[in-house]
């Protein structure tokens, strides 16, 4: 596993963004783990988060793209910090763009978007925290495609939970790929998280022991993507 992936897994744990225990998700599912991407709140956390996204995007998509698009609301800071990190790490100036929840009807920046305007010929990488249902893409892709003649290169999320999406068979990222045709990737998958943390001591404790691993296995037996 790449070094940046290992570091990102530990970063999620240290930031208390990825937690293990007993949780009830919005869907009503009982889950042995929970991710709250809103837990990144400090300057140093956001700086590191942008760097991990930049590493993963460069790893999967290279630098042949023009715009990072982050859907409102959580995608706005993600697109900003990742554009900064990409410039610093790879020397490539990438523009950021996000949509507004409500269209602004006045001022120099009026319209449906924040940041850079999308232009014909732009190659766009979309960025989100986590995709569990693909619903946000149903709203976002038509907006992006309708703004200009652009090509969506791919989507990057922080964690692939590897759970079935709306179709009940494939994970949400695969469903998005099948529906729209562009690549979908995550900085890490839950499989990689488990591989890195299972029965390994980290900062004086074993985060995923045999008991928790059994609970995770049972969860994926019921809800895991095929």
Task: Mark where each language-model region is.
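PRPP-associated nucleotide enzymes
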Residues: 1-127, 132-226
């Amino acid at each position: 596993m790449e070094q940046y992936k290992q570091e990102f897994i530990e970063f999620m744990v240290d930031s208390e963004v990825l937690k293990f225990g007993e949780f009830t998700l919005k869907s009503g599912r009982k889950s042995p783990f929970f991710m709250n991407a809103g837990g990144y709140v400090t300057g140093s956390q956001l700086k590191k988060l942008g760097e991990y996204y930049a590493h993963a995007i460069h790893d999967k998509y290279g630098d042949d793209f023009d715009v990072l698009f982050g859907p409102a609301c959580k995608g706005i800071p993600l697109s900003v910090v990742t554009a900064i990190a990409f410039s610093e790490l790879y020397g490539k100036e990438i523009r950021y763009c996000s949509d507004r929840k409500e269209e602004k009807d006045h001022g120099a920046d009026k319209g449906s978007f924040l940041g850079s305007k999308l232009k014909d010929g732009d190659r766009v990488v979309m960025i989100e925290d986590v995709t569990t249902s693909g619903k946000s893409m149903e709203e976002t892709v038509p907006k992006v495609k309708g703004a200009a003649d652009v090509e969506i290169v791919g989507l990057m999320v922080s964690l692939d939970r590897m759970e079935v999406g709306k179709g009940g068979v494939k994970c949400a990222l695969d469903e998005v790929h099948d529906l729209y045709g562009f690549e979908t990737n995550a900085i890490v998958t839950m499989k990689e998280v488990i591989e890195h943390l299972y029965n390994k001591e980290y900062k004086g404790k074993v985060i995923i022991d045999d008991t928790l691993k059994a609970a995770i296995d049972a969860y994926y037996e019921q809800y895991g993507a095929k």
